[in-house]
Amino acid sequence: MNAVITSLLFLSLVGLGYSWKYPRNADQTLWAFRTCQRRESDNNILKKWYTWELPNDEKTHCYVKCVWIHLGLYSKSKKSLRVNKIEKQFTSRGVAIPSDLKSMEGETDGSCKAIYDKTISFFNNNVADLRTAFYGTIEESNKWYSENPDAKPKGTKISKFCKDNNREQGESNCKHACSAYYYRLVDEDFEPIYFRLLEIKGFSNEDIDECIKQTSGRQGCQSSDALYDCLKNKNSAALKAALQILDDQSARTY
């Protein structure tokens, strides 16, 4: 699974871009944090990340880069953070824009260490406000979920949630409108998430490119159906195995 994710990440960053809507909600930020945390097995490190401690070590450097990517806040082409979107997240949450936000501007060399170095001073100065802005506390996260009962609850499997109430149909009598989004094969606009797809073991870059092309011209959740069907036709067993892993994870931490 890690190999699949790595290849997906590579493809998205060197190929297609993505630009998610801002502000992000608590479901979307939680997905970003948990996806990146699952790549680490050292419980001592994970405990620090869970409490928003970012020590100066190699694993944390890449964790920071991973989170910025999965929040849609890192531009591969410019090798820089999307500071205007960070500002929008703060504003949307009623949090004052930090005076040192502009310190996050500017190109990096794209390495984990460079992105960490660009981030850490701002992070240390504003960690409490960052946690509020990005729903990084249990209280803020739970408040959002209580106010948004249509979102998949924490601790509920994606498969169960999407099966209930015919959620898979979406608004266009689709087959995978709900699960394709919660597995993050597609974004909230049903556009393929290139780096996510590259993470799926058993598919070549060419397979992913071809399946993304199958979505061209499709509207709404019909695009996610076309993507899913293409992947299934390419390698049904690999797709099933990958989604089973994601489904099991969704019952534990997302």
Curated annotation (Swiss-Prot):
Protein known as: Long form salivary protein D7LC
Protein's job: Modulates blood feeding of female sandflies on vertebrate species by binding and sequestering different mediators involved in the host response. Binds leukotriene C4, leukotriene D4, leukotriene E4 and U-46619, a stable analog of thromboxane A2. Does not bind histamine or serotonin. Inhibits platelet aggregation induced by low concentrations of collagen in thromboxane A2-dependent manner.
Family: Belongs to the PBP/GOBP family.
GO molecular function: odorant binding; toxin activity
Keyword Signal: yes
InterPro entries hit by this protein: PBP/GOBP, PBP_GOBP_sf
Gene3D superfamilies for this protein: Pheromone/general odorant binding protein domain (1.10.238.20)
Compartments where found: Secreted
Keyword Mitochondrion recorded: no
Ligand binding (thromboxane A2): 49, 63, 154
List of residues binding leukotriene C4: 52, 136, 154
Sorted UniProt keywords: Disulfide bond, Hemostasis impairing toxin, Platelet aggregation inhibiting toxin, Secreted, Signal, Toxin
Name of one Pfam family that matches: PBP_GOBP
Annotated signal sequence range: 1-19
Disulfide bonds: 36-66, 62-112, 162-178, 174-221, 211-230
GO CC annotation, single: extracellular region
Transmembrane segments: none
Superkingdom as given in the UniProt entry: Eukaryota
